[in-house]
Amino acid sequence: MKTYSAKPSEIEKKWWVIDAKNIVLGRLASRVANMLRGKHKPSFTPHLDCGDNIIIINAAHVKLTGKKANTKDGKIYYRHTGFPGGIKNTTAGKILAGKHPERVIKMAVKRMITRNALGAKQMSNLYVYANSDHPHVGQEPVIYDFASQNPKNKSNYL
């Protein structure tokens, strides 16, 4: 028996929509990263973009467990301006309460995808929106019920 390797013409991409309201961030990000890579398909081929297109809505209502959501001493994100002494930091709580709360999900998924040209192509298949409106109705996305797969996925106790 030979090892199966998919050809680019054989790849079929589906559109999924995931509601992130009250969903734990890390569990959501790891599942979305696997779906973007295509690891949930039996025709997975590591060197091809065989993943699906993912739409995440209600990104502003994603949950962080423990003290990570605190605005003062929660999870810290660092960036550097490129100038001496130019390290800047912000917390996950400030980003979620700020102007672009969808960046928390994008950063979490991006850090779980490989850092190369294929990873950049796979990240272009991720669409994250802060509220429940999205412009991808024409693609007829299928609703992916992430919360019902495991009771730990939905954060009821926070």
Curated annotation (Swiss-Prot):
<dbReference type="GO" id="GO:0003735">
    <property type="term" value="F:structural constituent of ribosome"/>
</dbReference>
<comment type="function">
    <text>This protein is one of the early assembly proteins of the 50S ribosomal subunit, although it is not seen to bind rRNA by itself. It is important during the early stages of 50S assembly.</text>
</comment>
<dbReference type="InterPro" id="IPR005822">
    <property type="entry name" value="Ribosomal_uL13"/>
</dbReference>
<dbReference type="GO" id="GO:0003729">
    <property type="term" value="F:mRNA binding"/>
</dbReference>
<dbReference type="Pfam" id="PF00572">
    <property type="entry name" value="Ribosomal_L13"/>
</dbReference>
<keyword id="KW-0687">Ribonucleoprotein</keyword>
<protein>
    <recommendedName>
        <fullName>Large ribosomal subunit protein uL13</fullName>
    </recommendedName>
</protein>
<comment type="similarity">
    <text>Belongs to the universal ribosomal protein uL13 family.</text>
</comment>
<dbReference type="InterPro" id="IPR005823">
    <property type="entry name" value="Ribosomal_uL13_bac-type"/>
</dbReference>
<dbReference type="GO" id="GO:0006412">
    <property type="term" value="P:translation"/>
</dbReference>
<dbReference type="GO" id="GO:0022625">
    <property type="term" value="C:cytosolic large ribosomal subunit"/>
</dbReference>
<dbReference type="GO" id="GO:0017148">
    <property type="term" value="P:negative regulation of translation"/>
</dbReference>
<dbReference type="InterPro" id="IPR036899">
    <property type="entry name" value="Ribosomal_uL13_sf"/>
</dbReference>
<keyword id="KW-0689">Ribosomal protein</keyword>
<comment type="subunit">
    <text>Part of the 50S ribosomal subunit.</text>
</comment>
<dbReference type="InterPro" id="IPR023563">
    <property type="entry name" value="Ribosomal_uL13_CS"/>
</dbReference>
